[in-house]
UniProtKB/Swiss-Prot annotation:
Protein name per its UniProtKB record: Protein TusB
Signal peptide feature range: none
GO process annotations (BP): tRNA wobble position uridine thiolation
Predominant subcellular localization, coarse grouping: cytoplasm
GO cellular-component term (any): sulfurtransferase complex
Assembly information from the UniProt record: Heterohexamer, formed by a dimer of trimers. The hexameric TusBCD complex contains 2 copies each of TusB, TusC and TusD. The TusBCD complex interacts with TusE.
Family: Belongs to the DsrH/TusB family.
Function description: Part of a sulfur-relay system required for 2-thiolation of 5-methylaminomethyl-2-thiouridine (mnm(5)s(2)U) at tRNA wobble positions.
Localization per Swiss-Prot or TrEMBL: Cytoplasm
Length: 95
C-alpha cells in the first residue's frame, strides 16, 4: 500500500499509520507532511524505525524552504517517481 501524508505531523496521527505499515508498503510525505522528515525530529525517528520505505516529495521541500534540513535517510523524489509509486501500489491511503 502507498500511504501519502500531506499534513504536518503535529496535525495527524502518524503513530496509527505506523501500526498499519509493513515492509511491502511505501510512505510518501508531501505538502506539509514533509515536515516529518526534518533531521533529528522525533517524528523522523518513528518513521525510520518502521519497515516501510520513506519518500519525500522534493518540490514540496523546496516550496517550504527546507532544502538541506531533510534527513538523508529519507529518499527525495520527483513527481515522476510519485506517479511510479502510484502505479506500483494498487491501494493508496491518504493520511
Amino acid at each position: 500500500m502507498l500511504y501519502t501524508v500531506s499534513h504536518s505531523p503535529y496535525h495527524c496521527d502518524l503513530s496509527a499509520l505506523l501500526r498499519l505499515a509493513t515492509s511491502e508498503d511505501d510512505i510518501l510525505l508531501l505538502q506539509d507532511g514533509v515536515i516529518a522528515a526534518l533531521k533529528e525530529s522525533e517524528t523522523l525517528k518513528l518513521l525510520l524505525n518502521n519497515p516501510a520505505s520513506l519518500f519525500v516529495l522534493e518540490d514540496d521541500v523546496i516550496a517550504r524552504g527546507l532544502v538541506g534540513q531533510i534527513s538523508d535517510n529519507a529518499t527525495l523524489i520527483s513527481y515522476t517517481h510519485f506517479v511510479d509509486l502510484t502505479l506500483r501500489h494498487q491501494q493508496q491511503l491518504a493520511w
